[in-house]
Protein backbone atom coordinates (compact mmCIF):
# COMPACT_ATOMS: atom_id res chain seq x y z
CA UNK A 1 0.00 0.00 0.00
CA UNK A 2 1.41 3.35 -1.05
CA UNK A 3 1.55 6.34 1.27
CA UNK A 4 1.74 9.51 -0.80
CA UNK A 5 3.30 12.52 0.89
CA UNK A 6 2.86 16.01 -0.54
CA UNK A 7 5.70 18.29 0.52
CA UNK A 8 5.25 22.06 0.34
CA UNK A 9 6.80 25.16 1.83
CA UNK A 10 4.85 28.26 2.76
CA UNK A 11 5.36 31.71 1.27
CA UNK A 12 6.49 34.74 3.26
CA UNK A 13 2.88 35.55 4.16
CA UNK A 14 2.18 32.01 5.34
CA UNK A 15 0.12 31.03 2.30
CA UNK A 16 0.65 28.24 -0.22
CA UNK A 17 1.90 29.13 -3.68
CA UNK A 18 0.04 28.05 -6.78
CA UNK A 19 2.81 25.55 -7.57
CA UNK A 20 2.19 23.83 -4.22
CA UNK A 21 -1.52 23.51 -4.98
CA UNK A 22 -0.65 22.07 -8.38
CA UNK A 23 1.51 19.40 -6.73
CA UNK A 24 -1.33 18.67 -4.30
CA UNK A 25 -3.73 18.24 -7.23
CA UNK A 26 -1.33 15.78 -8.91
CA UNK A 27 -0.95 13.80 -5.68
CA UNK A 28 -4.70 13.79 -4.99
CA UNK A 29 -5.36 12.54 -8.53
CA UNK A 30 -2.79 9.79 -8.03
CA UNK A 31 -4.32 8.86 -4.67
CA UNK A 32 -7.76 8.59 -6.27
CA UNK A 33 -6.52 6.27 -9.00
CA UNK A 34 -4.48 4.07 -6.66
CA UNK A 35 -6.65 1.74 -4.59
CA UNK A 36 -5.71 1.43 -0.94
CA UNK A 37 -3.32 4.37 -0.96
CA UNK A 38 -3.10 7.06 1.71
CA UNK A 39 -2.54 10.77 1.12
CA UNK A 40 -0.75 12.92 3.70
CA UNK A 41 0.57 16.49 3.60
CA UNK A 42 3.83 17.86 4.98
CA UNK A 43 4.33 21.61 5.37
CA UNK A 44 7.48 23.57 6.17
CA UNK A 45 7.68 27.23 7.16
CA UNK A 46 7.73 29.81 9.91
CA UNK A 47 3.99 29.37 10.57
CA UNK A 48 2.09 26.70 8.67
CA UNK A 49 -1.34 26.64 10.31
CA UNK A 50 -2.86 29.15 7.87
CA UNK A 51 -1.58 27.14 4.92
CA UNK A 52 -2.89 23.89 6.39
CA UNK A 53 -6.31 25.42 7.02
CA UNK A 54 -6.49 26.65 3.42
CA UNK A 55 -6.40 23.03 2.15
CA UNK A 56 -8.21 21.36 5.04
CA UNK A 57 -10.88 19.92 2.72
CA UNK A 58 -8.40 18.02 0.56
CA UNK A 59 -8.49 14.19 0.77
CA UNK A 60 -5.39 14.03 3.00
CA UNK A 61 -5.86 11.96 6.14
CA UNK A 62 -3.03 13.56 8.08
CA UNK A 63 -1.00 16.76 8.18
CA UNK A 64 2.59 17.05 9.36
CA UNK A 65 4.47 20.25 9.97
CA UNK A 66 7.92 21.62 10.71
CA UNK A 67 7.83 25.21 11.91
CA UNK A 68 10.24 27.85 13.14
CA UNK A 69 12.15 30.87 11.94
CA UNK A 70 14.96 28.57 10.76
CA UNK A 71 12.62 27.08 8.17
CA UNK A 72 11.24 30.33 6.78
CA UNK A 73 14.07 30.79 4.29
CA UNK A 74 15.37 28.59 1.53
CA UNK A 75 18.43 26.72 2.76
CA UNK A 76 19.58 23.26 1.74
CA UNK A 77 20.63 21.98 5.16
CA UNK A 78 17.46 22.95 7.03
CA UNK A 79 15.08 22.10 4.18
CA UNK A 80 16.67 18.67 3.74
CA UNK A 81 16.50 17.96 7.47
CA UNK A 82 12.84 19.02 7.61
CA UNK A 83 11.90 16.96 4.55
CA UNK A 84 13.65 13.89 5.94
CA UNK A 85 11.97 14.26 9.33
CA UNK A 86 8.49 14.62 7.82
CA UNK A 87 9.13 11.69 5.50
CA UNK A 88 10.01 9.43 8.42
CA UNK A 89 7.08 10.61 10.52
CA UNK A 90 4.67 9.94 7.65
CA UNK A 91 6.27 6.59 6.71
CA UNK A 92 5.81 7.65 3.09
CA UNK A 93 6.69 5.61 0.03
CA UNK A 94 6.04 8.28 -2.60
CA UNK A 95 6.79 11.98 -2.20
CA UNK A 96 5.27 14.60 -4.52
CA UNK A 97 6.52 18.18 -4.37
CA UNK A 98 6.47 21.24 -6.64
CA UNK A 99 9.70 21.53 -8.62
CA UNK A 100 10.41 25.03 -7.37
CA UNK A 101 14.02 26.17 -7.09
CA UNK A 102 13.80 25.48 -3.36
CA UNK A 103 12.67 21.86 -3.64
CA UNK A 104 14.53 21.03 -6.84
CA UNK A 105 17.90 21.34 -5.15
CA UNK A 106 16.83 19.51 -1.98
CA UNK A 107 14.80 16.46 -2.98
CA UNK A 108 17.50 14.53 -4.91
CA UNK A 109 19.80 14.77 -1.90
CA UNK A 110 17.08 13.63 0.48
CA UNK A 111 16.28 10.72 -1.85
CA UNK A 112 19.94 9.72 -1.75
CA UNK A 113 19.99 9.84 2.06
CA UNK A 114 16.95 7.59 2.26
CA UNK A 115 18.08 5.14 -0.40
CA UNK A 116 15.37 6.22 -2.81
CA UNK A 117 15.12 7.68 -6.29
CA UNK A 118 14.12 11.12 -7.56
CA UNK A 119 12.62 12.28 -10.86
CA UNK A 120 12.41 15.95 -11.78
CA UNK A 121 10.52 17.97 -14.40
CA UNK A 122 7.55 15.63 -14.17
CA UNK A 123 4.51 16.86 -16.10
CA UNK A 124 2.04 14.09 -15.31
CA UNK A 125 1.42 11.51 -12.59
CA UNK A 126 -0.98 8.58 -12.79
CA UNK A 127 -1.56 4.95 -11.98
CA UNK A 128 -2.80 1.91 -13.89
CA UNK A 129 -3.09 -1.68 -12.69
CA UNK A 130 -1.68 -0.61 -9.34
CA UNK A 131 1.52 0.80 -10.86
CA UNK A 132 2.47 4.47 -10.58
CA UNK A 133 3.81 6.16 -13.69
CA UNK A 134 5.09 9.65 -14.40
CA UNK A 135 5.41 11.61 -17.62
CA UNK A 136 8.28 13.86 -18.57
CA UNK A 137 9.86 15.26 -21.73
CA UNK A 138 13.18 14.09 -23.19
CA UNK A 139 15.57 15.09 -25.95
CA UNK A 140 15.06 18.83 -25.77
CA UNK A 141 11.35 18.47 -25.20
CA UNK A 142 10.74 16.68 -28.50
CA UNK A 143 9.68 13.34 -27.01
CA UNK A 144 7.41 12.59 -24.09
CA UNK A 145 8.10 9.47 -22.09
CA UNK A 146 6.30 7.58 -19.35
CA UNK A 147 8.23 5.65 -16.72
CA UNK A 148 7.60 3.57 -13.62
CA UNK A 149 9.84 2.66 -10.70
CA UNK A 150 9.83 -0.17 -8.20
CA UNK A 151 12.37 1.58 -5.98
CA UNK A 152 10.94 3.25 -2.89
CA UNK A 153 10.90 5.91 -1.66
CA UNK A 154 10.21 7.70 -4.92
CA UNK A 155 10.53 11.49 -4.94
CA UNK A 156 8.63 13.26 -7.73
CA UNK A 157 9.15 16.92 -8.61
CA UNK A 158 6.14 18.28 -10.51
CA UNK A 159 6.89 21.13 -12.91
CA UNK A 160 4.96 24.31 -12.01
CA UNK A 161 2.33 25.16 -14.58
CA UNK A 162 1.86 21.58 -15.75
CA UNK A 163 -1.13 20.82 -13.49
CA UNK A 164 -4.30 22.66 -12.51
CA UNK A 165 -4.17 23.91 -8.91
CA UNK A 166 -6.09 22.00 -6.27
CA UNK A 167 -9.44 23.63 -5.49
CA UNK A 168 -9.57 22.26 -1.96
CA UNK A 169 -11.85 24.11 0.39
CA UNK A 170 -10.69 25.75 3.60
CA UNK A 171 -11.39 24.59 7.13
CA UNK A 172 -9.49 23.73 10.27
CA UNK A 173 -6.66 21.24 9.92
CA UNK A 174 -5.08 19.32 12.77
CA UNK A 175 -1.33 19.38 12.23
CA UNK A 176 1.10 16.98 13.89
CA UNK A 177 4.30 18.90 14.56
CA UNK A 178 7.58 17.15 13.85
CA UNK A 179 10.69 18.10 15.80
CA UNK A 180 13.92 18.67 13.87
CA UNK A 181 17.18 19.03 15.78
CA UNK A 182 19.43 21.44 13.91
CA UNK A 183 23.13 21.98 14.50
CA UNK A 184 24.80 25.37 14.25
CA UNK A 185 26.55 24.18 11.10
CA UNK A 186 23.22 23.63 9.34
CA UNK A 187 22.28 27.27 9.91
CA UNK A 188 25.45 28.90 8.59
CA UNK A 189 23.90 29.91 5.27
CA UNK A 190 21.63 32.94 5.55
CA UNK A 191 19.46 34.66 2.95
CA UNK A 192 20.27 38.36 3.26
CA UNK A 193 17.97 39.57 0.50
CA UNK A 194 16.36 38.89 -2.86
CA UNK A 195 17.44 40.56 -6.09
CA UNK A 196 14.86 40.35 -8.82
CA UNK A 197 13.88 42.42 -11.86
CA UNK A 198 11.19 45.02 -11.59
CA UNK A 199 7.72 43.92 -12.63
CA UNK A 200 8.01 45.81 -15.92
CA UNK A 201 11.37 44.17 -16.64
CA UNK A 202 10.05 40.65 -16.11
CA UNK A 203 9.57 39.02 -19.51
CA UNK A 204 8.82 35.41 -18.52
CA UNK A 205 5.30 35.13 -17.18
CA UNK A 206 4.09 31.49 -17.17
CA UNK A 207 0.55 32.51 -16.18
CA UNK A 208 0.13 34.95 -19.07
CA UNK A 209 -2.76 34.44 -21.48
CA UNK A 210 -0.58 35.39 -24.45
CA UNK A 211 2.82 34.16 -25.58
CA UNK A 212 4.65 36.66 -27.80
CA UNK A 213 7.49 35.06 -29.76
CA UNK A 214 10.21 37.21 -31.28
CA UNK A 215 11.44 35.77 -34.55
CA UNK A 216 14.98 36.34 -35.82
CA UNK A 217 13.68 38.92 -38.30
CA UNK A 218 13.52 41.68 -35.69
CA UNK A 219 17.30 42.14 -35.79
CA UNK A 220 17.78 41.59 -39.53
CA UNK A 221 17.98 44.30 -42.18
CA UNK A 222 14.62 45.84 -42.96
CA UNK A 223 13.17 47.29 -46.17
CA UNK A 224 15.54 50.28 -46.07
CA UNK A 225 18.58 48.01 -45.89
CA UNK A 226 19.32 48.89 -42.27
CA UNK A 227 18.76 47.18 -38.94
CA UNK A 228 16.51 48.82 -36.35
CA UNK A 229 17.35 47.01 -33.13
CA UNK A 230 16.63 49.96 -30.77
CA UNK A 231 13.21 50.43 -32.37
CA UNK A 232 12.50 46.69 -32.14
CA UNK A 233 13.44 46.75 -28.47
CA UNK A 234 11.10 49.66 -27.80
CA UNK A 235 8.18 48.06 -29.66
CA UNK A 236 8.54 44.64 -28.04
CA UNK A 237 9.03 45.90 -24.49
CA UNK A 238 6.19 48.37 -24.95
CA UNK A 239 3.88 45.56 -26.02
CA UNK A 240 4.93 43.31 -23.11
CA UNK A 241 4.39 46.12 -20.61
CA UNK A 242 0.88 46.89 -21.82
CA UNK A 243 -0.34 43.38 -22.63
CA UNK A 244 1.42 41.54 -19.76
CA UNK A 245 2.31 38.82 -22.27
CA UNK A 246 5.11 36.31 -21.81
CA UNK A 247 8.12 36.57 -24.11
CA UNK A 248 9.73 33.80 -26.10
CA UNK A 249 12.57 33.72 -28.61
CA UNK A 250 12.58 31.46 -31.63
CA UNK A 251 16.36 31.20 -31.93
CA UNK A 252 19.09 30.78 -29.36
CA UNK A 253 21.46 33.61 -28.54
CA UNK A 254 24.30 31.37 -29.72
CA UNK A 255 22.68 30.90 -33.13
CA UNK A 256 22.01 34.61 -33.53
CA UNK A 257 25.53 35.59 -32.51
CA UNK A 258 27.06 32.97 -34.77
CA UNK A 259 25.16 34.37 -37.74
CA UNK A 260 26.53 37.83 -37.04
CA UNK A 261 23.17 39.21 -35.98
CA UNK A 262 22.57 41.65 -33.20
CA UNK A 263 20.87 40.24 -30.11
CA UNK A 264 18.03 42.00 -28.35
CA UNK A 265 19.53 42.96 -24.97
CA UNK A 266 16.54 41.84 -22.87
CA UNK A 267 16.58 38.28 -24.19
CA UNK A 268 18.29 35.50 -22.28
CA UNK A 269 18.64 31.76 -22.81
CA UNK A 270 15.55 31.31 -20.62
CA UNK A 271 13.42 32.98 -23.29
CA UNK A 272 14.34 30.49 -25.99
CA UNK A 273 11.55 28.14 -26.91
CA UNK A 274 12.41 27.14 -30.47
CA UNK A 275 14.36 23.92 -30.80
CA UNK A 276 14.76 23.30 -27.09
CA UNK A 277 11.12 24.01 -26.29
CA UNK A 278 12.16 24.58 -22.70
CA UNK A 279 10.97 27.91 -21.31
CA UNK A 280 8.89 29.83 -20.72
CA UNK A 281 6.24 27.27 -19.92
CA UNK A 282 3.01 28.75 -21.17
CA UNK A 283 -0.39 27.90 -19.77
CA UNK A 284 -1.49 26.60 -23.17
CA UNK A 285 1.65 24.61 -23.81
CA UNK A 286 4.90 25.28 -25.60
CA UNK A 287 5.18 27.12 -28.87
CA UNK A 288 7.57 27.42 -31.75
CA UNK A 289 8.54 30.65 -33.47
CA UNK A 290 5.93 33.09 -34.73
CA UNK A 291 5.47 31.46 -38.12
CA UNK A 292 6.45 27.91 -37.25
CA UNK A 293 9.70 27.76 -39.18
CA UNK A 294 10.89 24.99 -36.88
CA UNK A 295 8.28 22.27 -37.48
CA UNK A 296 10.12 19.73 -35.34
CA UNK A 297 9.41 21.76 -32.23
CA UNK A 298 6.80 20.02 -30.12
CA UNK A 299 4.03 21.90 -28.41
CA UNK A 300 3.00 24.05 -31.37
CA UNK A 301 -0.18 22.02 -31.51
CA UNK A 302 -1.07 22.98 -27.92
CA UNK A 303 -1.52 26.69 -28.64
CA UNK A 304 -5.21 27.53 -29.05
CA UNK A 305 -4.85 30.33 -31.59
CA UNK A 306 -1.71 31.10 -33.57
CA UNK A 307 -1.23 34.48 -35.20
CA UNK A 308 1.77 35.32 -37.37
CA UNK A 309 3.16 38.42 -39.07
CA UNK A 310 5.10 37.99 -42.30
CA UNK A 311 5.81 40.11 -45.38
CA UNK A 312 5.75 36.98 -47.51
CA UNK A 313 2.15 35.97 -48.33
CA UNK A 314 3.43 32.67 -49.69
CA UNK A 315 5.39 31.72 -46.59
CA UNK A 316 4.70 28.01 -46.34
CA UNK A 317 5.04 27.75 -42.58
CA UNK A 318 2.85 30.76 -41.96
CA UNK A 319 0.13 29.53 -44.30
CA UNK A 320 0.27 26.00 -42.95
CA UNK A 321 0.68 26.69 -39.25
CA UNK A 322 -0.92 30.02 -38.40
CA UNK A 323 -4.64 30.46 -37.71
CA UNK A 324 -4.38 34.14 -38.63
CA UNK A 325 -1.70 35.60 -40.91
CA UNK A 326 -0.98 39.32 -41.15
CA UNK A 327 0.82 40.07 -44.41
CA UNK A 328 2.51 43.24 -43.23
CA UNK A 329 5.61 44.77 -41.70
CA UNK A 330 5.94 43.58 -38.09
CA UNK A 331 7.34 46.95 -37.01
CA UNK A 332 4.28 48.78 -38.32
CA UNK A 333 1.83 46.21 -36.98
CA UNK A 334 3.26 46.25 -33.47
CA UNK A 335 3.46 50.04 -33.45
CA UNK A 336 -0.27 50.15 -34.24
CA UNK A 337 -1.04 47.47 -31.65
CA UNK A 338 0.83 49.43 -28.98
CA UNK A 339 -1.05 52.56 -29.97
CA UNK A 340 -4.39 50.78 -29.60
CA UNK A 341 -3.38 49.26 -26.27
CA UNK A 342 -2.32 52.65 -24.96
CA UNK A 343 -5.61 54.20 -26.07
CA UNK A 344 -7.61 51.38 -24.49
CA UNK A 345 -5.70 51.61 -21.23
CA UNK A 346 -6.23 55.34 -21.00
Residue ranges of predicted features:
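N-terminal glycine-rich FAD/FM-binding segment characteristic of electron-transfer flavoproteins
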Residues: 1-346
Amino acid sequence: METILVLAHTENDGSLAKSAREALHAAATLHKSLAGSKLVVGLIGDNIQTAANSIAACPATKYFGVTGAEFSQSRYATDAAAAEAIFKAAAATVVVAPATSRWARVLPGVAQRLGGRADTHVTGVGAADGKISVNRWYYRQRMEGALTRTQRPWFIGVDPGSQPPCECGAGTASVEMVTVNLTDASKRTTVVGIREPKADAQTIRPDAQLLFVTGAGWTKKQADGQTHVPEAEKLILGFLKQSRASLGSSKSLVDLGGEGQAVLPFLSHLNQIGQTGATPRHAKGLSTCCHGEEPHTVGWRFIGERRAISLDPNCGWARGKADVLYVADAFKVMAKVNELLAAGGA
